[in-house]
Swiss-Prot record:
Pfam families: CofH_C, Radical_SAM. [4Fe-4S] cluster 1 binds at C89, C93, C96. Keywords: 4Fe-4S, Iron, Iron-sulfur, Lyase, Metal-binding, S-adenosyl-L-methionine, Transferase. It comes from Streptomyces coelicolor (strain ATCC BAA-471 / A3(2) / M145). The keyword ATP-binding does not apply. Its EC number is 4.3.1.32, 2.5.1.147. This is FO synthase. Residues 845-859 have a biased composition (Basic and acidic residues).
Length: 867
């Protein structure tokens, strides 16, 4: 038997699968063997008895998953209201009737957006009927296409559509008790940070990975920038990185081939396995609508849908939650149950399906009866799936916990039958800082060490290690090139600003005598630019908390709040440490911390203000770009507004940490939820524009290669040419010992001595003449290693630190502080004089120098600071 190789609406393919290939694929599915994309494409074409066999095995997979999840024989749904916040959109999908134009809205007497009162009216009526979900759906970025949308947002005080979505969501939570499930289309990483605190779940259909349906004229997505598959896959990745429970799925029957349909499912599986964040997969069948460009296309046939559901179940596995919208079939619900679904999606007793208005939702009693006839019990869930309700952090923002807890059964995570749907205050944590946990870590890390080499949720918080190993494989061993570096050395010696990328890359690979020559050239450039003085700063690190759920895979500092080594300092403790530092000659405190979900929205302002009030003369060097973004999203301010407010609170400069490698290819292996490279650059450039100087950094020697170092340094040089705001460049060799990405067998064990010398020397040359100060890290390299870098182009030793927990938690063995005499000794070892400096590389007042000399720049005793 042979069948057509295309869907009922797809372009013609060669002859379909043979009987043997179908039987072989069915056997593999029946036996639970992993399918590949070609086998999935074969099974998508199963019909008749073959389809019956396929659905039977898919149902068994589904049943095993429900048993493992503790809800055997249960099919779920969400009782919801549909809120079409705006029907304007910048896209032009050829099958869509949801989207309209401003003129039609005006003629119908509607605004460009629903008003808050209109939204709340629907939500209140839904709450009265027992609904618990507000499905907020809207067009993509309408203000980018329609001036009327931009004017509406401006008139109502919103910077963009996402800001309005956030504001409306808060009002729904506070005034009705419904939980927002957000479908605003394509979102950026920053958008997720803004919306995560106000919505337990979000969603966006992938639809298809068939790029031709977007790129070719006449395709269903042609002319729609937000329907490019690569863009939509990036959204799914960003949702996973941000630990947002996310709903996605495919739309079948819009012209894709079976192979393309299979690839779309495998793309969803890849994201799901990498981040474990896809809470629900929707298999949606195309229904042609009048007054659209695709009105003549045939609907996807029922067998197409049933086969797609069954194949999706086999590909995604037993733990996946699989939905097919019940209003898009004609009462053939039992076939969808038989194919492996375990959810009916959102069903509203109040509102229509505004995307498919011609297809009314079935009554909940009807779904219950159909489910019961198939041997299943219909149970209500929340918009956020039970697994994520039970997991809690980092998937549920602390600000949403009380809202979800009011509606969820604590044992099952499903909706509570007796829940009263009513509003609850949504607010940032406003309790004062309280000291918790191991607040003596800064003192005891050197004597007692850390309690464990890894946090308790090691196997969960960082995503799927297997998927990461595949992505990181090219960087496990840096590539080596066989290049004559003589010409490159000659260029560097003559004028390092003329180095081409090929020459620079050759020098980054230099070894032996060539490396010695490179370091000599860099040292000559250093001498001509900043002289022989080795600068240092008397400073204290204050890491005010190590509680963090971001999931950076290189970081051994971050802990869950319940881990043995977790701690948070009070504001008084922060101020006490700053005062102690001042008394022994410090001119700066460097303050950074984990992204603690319970800190109040004003936390960073409060910290800066506490130090300035206690020690007015202290320079506050604080808050990485990641913390800046966190502060901005939590306060609802733009990055510029937040930095301005932080400056007013006492912030003097920002550390250029959280840069790692400014290449997202590497960045998304190293970090799970940290900001993208473009956002780091935005924060730094905005700070510079506001007169807030910063350092710059690069962490290297993990899953990166020299080409990444080159790109990173070129990026920093470009920023400095534009802003002039960098004070220094700091090399940060990767400390591997306790780093999760190393413990999982993915990263290299840090850079070699060759790497350190080459990076230091090339930083001097590639950043010349824009960034004159190159700092080496005694914390990471020790005194001998730091002295070697001073002979390779570096001119600065960093600070006394007084306490250091980040590198020590990672496994650095070089201690937590250095005295002034210690740092002078390092400079002596390099044959150079030492000189104190300020954060901005200015002269240190004599009074500060005297205090440092009298104390030797370190505390009399490093003991826990108690209230």
């Amino acid at each position: 038997m042979t069948t057509s190789a295309t869907s009922g609406t797809g372009p013609a393919d060669p002859a379909g699968p043979t009987e043997n290939s179908m039987r072989r694929a069915l056997k593999r599915a029946r036996d639970g063997v992993a399918l590949d994309a070609s086998e999935a494409a074969v099974l998508l074409q199963a019909r008749g008895a073959h389809l019956d066999a396929l659905t039977a095995s898919a149902a068994r997979v589904r049943d095993a998953g429900l048993e493992a999840a503790g809800r055997p024989g249960v099919i779920t749904y969400s009782k919801s209201v549909f809120v079409p916040l705006t029907r304007l959109c910048r896209d032009k999908c050829h099958y869509c009737t949801f989207v309209t134009v401003p003129g039609k809205l005006r003629r119908a007497g509607h605004g460009m957006f629903m008003s808050p009162d209109e939204v709340l009216d629907i939500a209140r009526k839904g709450a009265a009927l027992g609904c618990k979900e507000a499905l907020i759906t809207l067009g993509d970025k309408p203000e980018d296409r329609w001036p009327e949308a931009r004017e509406w947002l401006d008139a109502h005080g919103y910077d963009d559509t996402i800001a309005y979505v956030r504001a409306v969501s808060i009002r729904i939570l506070e005034e009705t008790g419904l939980l927002p499930h957000l479908n605003p289309g394509v979102m950026t990483w920053t958008d997720f940070q803004r919306l995560k605190p106000v919505a337990p779940s979000m969603g966006m259909m992938l639809e298809t990975t068939a790029t031709r349906l977007w790129s070719e004229p006449g395709g269903p997505h042609h002319g729609s920038p937000d329907k490019e598959p690569a863009v939509r896959l990036r959204v799914l990745e960003d949702a996973g990185r941000s630990s947002v429970p996310f709903t996605s799925g495919i739309l079948i029957g819009i012209g894709e081939t079976y192979e393309e349909r299979a690839e779309s499912l495998f793309a969803l599986r890849r994201v799901s396995r990498s981040y474990h964040g896809i809470q629900e997969l929707i298999i949606q069948n195309f229904r042609a609508k009048p007054d659209t460009a695709m009105r003549g296309m045939p609907d996807a046939e029922l067998d197409e849908l049933v086969a797609a559901v069954a194949v999706a179940r086999h590909i995604m596995g037993p733990s996946a939650c699989l939905q097919a919208p019940p209003n898009l079939v004609d009462a053939e619900y039992e076939r969808l149950i038989g194919a492996g679904i375990d959810d009916w999606g959102g069903v509203s007793p109040l509102t229509i399906d505004h995307v498919n208005p011609e297809r009314p939702w079935p009554q909940i009693d009807e779904l219950a009866a159909t489910s019961r006839a198939a041997g299943f019990e219909l149970r209500e869930r929340l918009c956020v799936y039970p697994e994520f309700v039970r997991r809690g952090e980092p998937w549920l923002d602390p600000r949403l916990r009380p809202h979800v807890a009011a509606l969820a059964d604590p044992e099952t995570g499903l909706a509570r039958e007796d829940a009263v749907v009513e509003g609850h205050a949504w607010q940032e944590p406003d309790e004062a800082f309280t000291a918790t946990g191991r607040t003596d870590l800064h003192a005891t890390i050197d004597t007692e060490g850390r309690t464990s080499d890894r946090r308790d949720d090691f196997d969960e918080v960082y995503g799927d290690w297997g998927a990461l190993r595949e992505a990181a494989a090219p960087g496990m061993a840096p590539e080596r090139i066989d290049t004559d570096v003589r010409a490159a050395l000659a260029t560097a010696a003559d004028d390092p600003t003329k180095l081409t990328d090929d020459e620079a890359l050759a020098l980054l690979h230099a070894e032996g005598p060539a490396l010695d020559a490179l370091c000599g050239i860099a040292d000559d450039v250093r001498r001509s630019v900043v002289g022989d003085d080795v600068t240092y700063i008397v400073t204290r690190n204050i890491n005010f908390t190590n509680v963090c759920y971001t999931g950076c895979r290189f970081c051994a500092f971050a802990q869950r709040r319940t881990d043995a080594d977790a701690y948070t300092l009070s504001l008084d403790q922060v101020a006490d440490r700053a005062q102690q530092a001042w008394e022994v000659g410090a001119v700066e405190v460097c303050m950074q911390g984990g992204i603690h979900p319970d800190l109040p929205g004003t936390a960073y302002f409060d910290i800066a203000r506490a130090v300035k009030e206690r020690v007015p003369g202290m320079h506050v060097h604080a808050f990485s770009p990641m913390e800046v973004v966190n502060g901005a999203t939590r306060t609802g301010l733009s990055i510029r507004e937040w930095l301005t407010a932080a400056k007013e609170a006492g912030l003097d400069s920002v550390p250029g940490t959280a840069a790692e490698i400014l290449d997202d290819e590497v960045r998304w292996i190293l970090t799970k939820g940290k900001l993208p490279a473009a956002t780091w650059i935005e924060v730094i450039e905005t700070a510079h524009e506001l007169g807030i100087r910063s350092s710059s950094t690069m962490m290297y020697g993990h899953v990166d290669q020299p080409r990444h170092w080159l790109g990173h340094l070129r990026t920093l040089a470009g920023i400095q040419r534009r802003t002039g705001g960098f004070t220094e460049f700091v090399t940060l060799p990767f400390i591997h010992t306790n780093a999760p990405v190393y413990l999982a067998g993915i990263a290299r064990p840090g850079p070699t001595l060759r790497d350190n010398r080459a990076v230091t020397a090339m930083a001097r040359l590639l950043l010349h003449p824009h960034i004159p100060n190159i700092q080496t890290s005694w914390v990471k390299l020790g005194t001998e290693g730091a002295a070697e870098m001073l002979r390779s182009g570096a001119n600065d030793l960093g600070g006394t630190l007084m306490e250091e927990t980040i590198s020590r938690m990672a496994g650095s063995s070089y201690g937590s502080y250095k005295s002034v005499k210690d740092l002078i000794a390092v400079a002596d070892a390099a044959g150079r004089p030492a000189k104190p400096r300020t954060t901005l590389y200015g002269p240190v007042p004599e009074e500060r120098q005297r205090a440092a000399r009298d104390s030797d720049g370190h505390l009399p005793e490093l003991l826990p600071v108690l209230d």
